[in-house]
Amino acid sequence: MEPAVSLAVCALLFLLWVRVKGLEFVLIHQRWVFVCLFLLPLSLIFDIYYYVRAWVVFKLSSAPRLHEQRVQDIQKQVREWKEQGSKTFMCTGRPGWLTVSLRVGKYKKTHKNIMINLMDILEVDTKKQIVRVEPLVSMGQVTALLNSIGWTLPVLPELDDLTVGGLIMGTGIESSSHKYGLFQHICTAYELILADGSFVRCTPSENSDLFYAVPWSCGTLGFLVAAEIRIIPAKKYVKLRFEPVRGLEAICEKFTHESQRLENHFVEGLLYSLDEAVIMTGVMTDDVEPSKLNSIGSYYKPWFFKHVENYLKTNREGLEYIPLRHYYHRHTRSIFWELQDIIPFGNNPIFRYLFGWMVPPKISLLKLTQGETLRKLYEQHHVVQDMLVPMKCLSQALHTFQNDIHVYPIWLCPFILPSQPGLVHPKGDEAELYVDIGAYGEPRVKHFEARSCMRQLEKFVRSVHGFQMLYADCYMNREEFWEMFDGSLYHKLRKQLGCQDAFPEVYDKICKAARH
C-alpha cells in the first residue's frame, strides 16, 4: 500500500508543478519528465495491445477472411467520393502523428480521408518463399512472426514501428541492402485500389508499369491494400565483426570494400567524426561461442551506438554473436541516437535496469505531444535526414555533411540500386552501389539556418545523382524535385489512371509547405 501512496503523492506533486509552470514549459524544458512519467508507460500499453492483437489474429487465421471485406469497404468509400463529385483529393485516413516521420501532413485536414484498417499478416507461403501482408503491418510484427518459424525478410528496416506501406510508398533500407537493394526490390506484387475504385494487382510481368511506379509515390497512384514480399531462411544469430577505422580515406576504402563483398550478409558503418568510424560486417549463423554472445536488445544492455563507440575508444576490433531479432532492432531502443536528446540519462545503467523495459517511447506519441513551440525549435535546431548518394561520392558527401550541418554520429548503410523504371534508379543502364548517409541530431555548424543549409545539401545530392528520403524535410522547389527524381513513368500513369483529380502529386505531399 505504501508504494501506491508514494506514487500517488508524486503524481499529485507533478500535476501541481505542471499547473504552476504550465504544460508547454514542461514539454520544452523538462521533456524527459513528461516522457518518463507518461509516454513510456503509454507506449508499453500500446505495444502490448498490438502484440496480443496480432498474435490472436494470426492464430485464429481471421485476417484472410476479413481482408476481402475490408478491401470492399475501401472501394465503397472511393466510389462514394466519386458520386459526391470528387471535390477534393483523397488520402488515407490514418492520423499524421502515427507515421514514423518528424512532421505531420497538413493535407489530412483538407483531403477526403479514406479509412484503411489493414494491419495484419495474411499468409506465409514457405514453398514459394513469400509473405503476403497488409500495408499497416509493422516490422516488429514481421520479425516476431517470421523469426519464430525460421524465416526472415531479406531487407528488414530497423525501427519496430515502420510499416510495410510506408516502406513501399516511401522507401526502406537495412544493412543487407548491399545484397538485396531497397525494400521495394524484395517486393514481388502490390495490390491497389485505384482512383475509380477498381482493384488491381501488379507484378514485374503484370501491370509492370504500375509495379515500378508505386515505390516512392507516397500513395498518389492508388491505395495499397496488400503486398507480397520475398522471405529467406533465417538463422539464430548474427556473427558481427567490429573494426574501428581512422582517416576518411581509409574509412571510405574499407566501407566500399566490405559493401562489395556479397558473402557479408550485413554491412554498416557508424561515423563518430569525419575521420573516426566503426565498420561492422555480419553473417547469419546457427553456431555461437557462448563467451561472445551479446543479447544487445535486452532492456538492461547499453544502447547499441554507445556499445559500438567503445570499440573506437579502446581502439580494438571485436567479434560478437547477436540474436537475429536483437540485431534487426539494434537501434530501436535508442531510436538510433535521438533518445539521448530526449532522455539525457537514458543510457545510465541505473535507468536501464529500472526503466529500460519501457524504452523507447513511441515516435508517434512524441510527435503528438510536442506542441507548436517545440516543433519550431526542432525545425530550426534539429536535423533528421537520409541522403542516398553513389558510393563513389562517399568522401565528397561526408565533407559536404560536415560543412553544411556537422551532425554526428552519422549512419552509413550501403545498397545496390538496380537499373529499373520508376522514380529512383541509377544514372546509367547498370546497377550501381549507393550509400545511405543518415544524419540525426542537433547541427553543430556555426550559424545553422535550416532552410539555407538544407537547400545547400540538397543541391549537392542532386549534383551527384543522389536522392533524398521523402519522410524528411524537403526544401526543394518543384523543378528541383523533378530534377532529382525521374517522373516520366509516374506522370504517364497519373494521367492514364485518372489520378490527377484524385490524388495530389507526390511533391505536394512531401514538400516543406505541405507539412508542419
From Swiss-Prot:
One of its GO terms (molecular function) is oxidoreductase activity, acting on the CH-CH group of donors, NAD or NADP as acceptor. Its EC number is 1.3.1.72. Pathway: Steroid biosynthesis; cholesterol biosynthesis. FAD binds at residues 163-175. The chain crosses the membrane at residues 32-52. Residues 58-234 form the FAD-binding PCMH-type domain. Residues 1-22 form the signal peptide. It catalyses: cholesterol + NADP(+) = desmosterol + NADPH + H(+); lanosterol + NADPH + H(+) = 24,25-dihydrolanosterol + NADP(+); 5alpha-cholest-8-en-3beta-ol + NADP(+) = zymosterol + NADPH + H(+). The keyword Transmembrane applies. This is Delta(24)-sterol reductase. It comes from Rattus norvegicus (Rat).
